[in-house]
Amino acid sequence: MDTIRLTIDGQQIEVPEGTTILEAARTADIYIPSLCFHPDLPPAKDHPAVEAVFHGHHKIENAHPEQSGKGCGICVVEVAGNSELAGACATAAVDGMVVTTQNERIEAKRRENLLSIMARHRHACLTCAQRDGCSLSPCSTDVPENERCCEQFGHCELQQVANFVGIPDTTPRWVPTDYPVFKDDPLFERDYNLCIGCTRCVRACRDLRGIEALGFVLDENGQAQVGTVAETLDDSGCKFCTACVA
């Protein structure tokens, strides 16, 4: 296989042709934050939405059928010669390319994109001044339990990315969405209140397993809403392989 050479943050890197900027950076231990990327999955950007998804009996229709997935937008970088920032997870590295992963413009855009994710996800624990020594319960700042910690606290990808990118001061308080929590299915529970719309579960179901029991639509604000393609996992064709939660 042919190889190419590119420069990322002043470091010259040689990778196989077809490698993305994000993958190239990781071969050189250059960290580019991301939430929707997974090495075994195709990029979230341009992944097709479906006509409708279900949260149990509640049907959610696609408000933007002309659009496809956008990805999280956290992995944006600058490519010399391009006026627009590029998503590192979906942009192929090109021979001679010069990439910058950290500067004021990039950091501002990442914070902007993170804000749109944080605004629809419980995040009180990520902004709490006492989060490093928190015992999770009771809350010393009297934040209601449904607005704060989940079981992933301390081991959460969103928390790690937020710590690196920086949580915008303008992040509004999360308003509880009261999405349903499904506990009756075998092997795993589904709590849509914790979904950040990364669509990794959707892509794992479709591209790793070839099942397509899960899908996503775009709501009125263009945000991804994930759900099953029928009212139940069984009716959606789920095999309970757990690829979506692995």
Question: What do the predicted segments below correspond to?
Answer:
Residues 1-246:
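Ferredoxin-type iron-sulfur electron-transfer modules and their immediate structural context
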